[in-house]
Amino acid sequence: LAKFGDAEAAIRLIDEVGKGTHLGRILGNGAAFTARAFGIERAPVVKGQAMPAYDPRAIQGIGVTYATSTMGADHTAGYAIATNVLKVGGFVDPLKPEGQVELSRNLQIATAAIDSTGMCLFIAFAVLDQPETFQALLDLLNAFYGLSLTADSVADLGKTILRAEREFNIG
C-alpha cells in the first residue's frame, strides 16, 4: 500500500477513505480490521484498538494500561505517562515492572471518575502535583452538582464505572 515515510502515498490512502472506495472502506474500519482483511496476523492493536501515541515497550506503565483497560490501547484510560515520564505525582521507572500495575490501576480509577464529571483528564496534573487542589476540585464538583463527594466516594465512583464498562464489554 505504501512504504514507510511515503507522505504522498499516505495522502492517497486517506483520499481512498474519503471517497469510500473498497480499499478506503477497509482502511476506514481501523488497523485491526485492515490487518484481518489483508491476512496480517500481527498488528499494533490491543482489544481491537490501534496503538496510540506511546510505545508500551519503552513505558511499561502505559503497557499495563493498554492491556487492562476496558478500551484496549487507549493512553488516556490511565495516563501513566504522567508519572513514568513527566514525573507528575511522583515517579515510577518506566523501564522496570515494579509499581506499574498499581500506577495503572490507580490512574484508571481516577480517570474514570474524572471522565464522568465532563472535565478534561488533564486536570489530574494539578491534583497529582498539588494534592491540596484535590479538595478544591471536590468543593467545585459538590457546589456545582449539589453533591457531597469525598476522596473515598470519588475512588468508589471510578471503580463502579470501570466495573460497568467491563460488564458492558462482556455482555
Predicted feature residues:
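Extended C-terminal regions of large enzymes
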Residues: A2-G171
